[in-house]
Amino acid sequence: MLTPMQTLEKVNTKIKPQWKTAFLSTLVIGLLIHMPALLSDIPNHDGLDSMYFDQNMITSGRWFLTVACGFSSYFSIPWMIGLLGLLFLAGTSVVLTELLELKDKTVVCLVSGLLVAFPAFASTVAYVFTLDGYMLAMFLATLSVLLVKKFRYGFLAGAVCLAFSVGTYQAYLSFAVILCVYMIVRLLIEQGEWKDKLRKVCRYLLMGVIGLILYVVVLSVLLAVQGKELASYQGISGMGNVAGTGLLGNIKNIYVDFVSFTGAGNILFNNVFSGLAVAVLAVCLIVTVVRKTIGGKWWKKLTFYAVLLLLALGLPVATNLILIISPDVTYHLLMRYQWVLYLIIAVDFVSRYAGKQNTVCADFRECMERTGGCVSGWLCWAASVAAVILIFNYAVTDNIAYANLEKKYEKTYAYCVRLLDRIEQTEGYYQGIPIAMIGVVGDEQFPVTDITGEFTGNMIGMNGDSLLYTGANYEAFMKHYLGATLNFLEPEVMNDIYYSDEYVEMDSFPGKNSVKVVDGIMYVKTENKNRD
């Protein structure tokens, strides 16, 4: 029997160098960018209620999330959860490297850097209590595609991986679908028998169909066992009702959202430099496609135009599958991670199909005469530089968001200290007194001071001034960060008080009349005095 060291040495001989590069580059770049957040306890508004949460989200269709998040315990411990999340993401980088057949270590580093720097990861870090589970879901989604590509019956194992991925977080279904589409496109581009290509395409389709059927079956069984139904949260109760008018009614929203987020979402690019980098990457991709089209005489084939049309019509839908699954969803940035694949695909496509004849020319004239080699070289260089610029820009954006999240915490802490002092100093207060409170911080008394809105506007959970939106947020913050246990009334009870004359006439905190006791209940008014 081999010793542990001998086993490790034997395993090490099986690991490809580019896998090590992908894994280590993801970890190193990830720690350099995200360590400030992972070493801090800076929750967002959802994090306040998730200091300990078993992640049993079966009613949201996430039947595997409780297991996926269980490795790090159910406590919100950013450093441990963050490390596990980065390890799973590094695994995704390795799978992508093998899936895309990346050999060039520079390209491997660029792909890994884009994956770990993209602001959707920072947005997920803001919801750190689910970070490790979500990154495991992404790993499984990517692995499902690789299994189909590598093995004849890999679509079966891939279907299982896809089912568990969707059972952890439905948003990463788009991640798998886009990768499948790209693999099919590469299949069509490269040499081979059409019958063989068709069989491989069918395997990708089978993986998706079987995987989703398995997901629904497991979900139905677990809901029945637990005696629960799908919740209305994020429109999940309508999941699967996409036939007929339901699907057609969402098509417009899908295309509008795709175009608006891509062009004006302030995430893919948010300044001149990142805008130019995305433009350069797009131009490199287009030029490479045009060269391949001319060289392969694709422009003479009707199938070429059919494929282009299908891609133009299908990719926005594939990217926004969450809008079909949950049409009423609040589309958080952490649900938009799949957009990074377009950047990764551009880098891969250029390096794969433009870099095969890379030669060096003596001068510009020779470069013009020898378009084959030098154009390839310029395309590879331009795409690489653009990717580096984007990685750096995303790193800056991530840390701007982290800085604002920390300031949100500090502002919330200062606000709650003042409010708690007022509550405890109000005549009639005693420990356990029922407190009636809406929770929103009024902008009349506390004007917005967030200066990062231009960059964090679409990063839900990391933008704004305060962590407080509901009475439950106040209760959790004061309990976990101020050590105060307060008895807030349920929202249903608060509804009647909110419309009472006594409450309407109160000042907004920190007004003199913003906290008082009425009939044994403490009224606390924090929202604007004047209602719209």
Language-model features, listed with the residues they occupy:
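Membrane-interface alpha helices of multi-pass inner-membrane proteins
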Residues: 154-170, 175-181
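Juxtamembrane "helix-exit" motif on the non-cytosolic side of transmembrane helices
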Residues: 37-44, 117-127, 188, 216-225, ...
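Membrane-interface micro-motifs in multi-pass membrane enzymes
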Residues: 58, 62, 85-88, 106-149, ...
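Intrinsically disordered, polar/acidic, low-complexity terminal segments
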Residues: 2-59, 63, 69-91, 99-112, ...
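Perimembrane helix-loop-helix junctions
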Residues: 175-209
